[in-house]
Amino acid sequence: MAAHCRGTELDLSWISKVQVNHAAVLRRAQQIQARRSVKKEWQAAWLLKAVTFIDLTTLSGDDTFSNVQRLCYKAKYPIRADLLKALNMDDKGITTAAVCVYPARVCDAVKALKAAGCSIPVASVATGFPAGQTHLKTRLEEIRLAVEDGATEIDVVINRTLVLTGQWEALYDEVTQFRKACGEAHLKTILATGELGSLTNVYKASLVAMMAGSDFIKTSTGKETVNATFPVAIVMLRAIRDFFWKTGNKVGFKPAGGIRTAKESLAWLSLVKEELGDEWLTPDLFRIGASSLLSDIERQIYHHVTGRYAAYHDLPMS
């Protein structure tokens, strides 16, 4: 991943002036979603690119070593070898961007990836995921333990109460402490946008998280009623762009929750390309958090190569 975001001092004057035009954001989202997807002859290339942005995730209460081991194997070999060969991509080393697990499963992921001879990063959720409603000391210790166990990326959740009550200094202080607890690990800050009340709050929370040194800002835990949506993404991407223009810091973006189909993944790539440009279409600055998306991408690539849709037994389990 790219160098850490340096962060800045908290700029309350900037935050206080923020006001998002809700109607304009909705119009922009509708414009983008109404456009045609990538042309058929280019779809396979774009879908393979999408694979390299996926944080392949398992966050279930019944996760075991075998689940995590299978996840890691799929992360290393995301697309069947013969399909890659048919596309002349078998020598490109295509993998997912990372695997993402609960803190208690980090050791399992590190062990499985090491056994597979693979250097894919291990990301861990932390800070009382998904609600973030535990004591700060506990949340910080959870980060430290995940890093000690081998996680090189930490997906933290913010305390949504601080956003809803306008406690921007407290939010900045908490995320700054998360950043410090991560050490050399990269910090991805989950805003849980479906629980922030307004698009203006989404923009403000995005700014505060970036000022505090977040390397990525992320839409959702995937556990909220409303997860990644285009209106929310547009607001976050504009905040990333404005922060870059003002500070020179490039911060990554990660939508998560409800992104299940290949078509949806292409729409997200197009959105990022339009709002931030090709510079952001790299795993250093763009990720997609997903558990079932990869299976649909592989099915679409199978169809592109063979001309027919795969039966369930045609593709390995993910």
Swiss-Prot record:
It comes from the Eukaryota. Its main location: cytoplasm. Pathway: Carbohydrate degradation; 2-deoxy-D-ribose 1-phosphate degradation; D-glyceraldehyde 3-phosphate and acetaldehyde from 2-deoxy-alpha-D-ribose 1-phosphate: step 2/2. SMART domains: DeoC. InterPro entries: Aldolase_TIM (IPR013785), DeoC (IPR011343), DeoC/FbaB/LacD_aldolase (IPR002915). Belongs to the DeoC/FbaB aldolase family. DeoC type 2 subfamily. NCBIfam families: deoC (TIGR00126). This is Deoxyribose-phosphate aldolase.
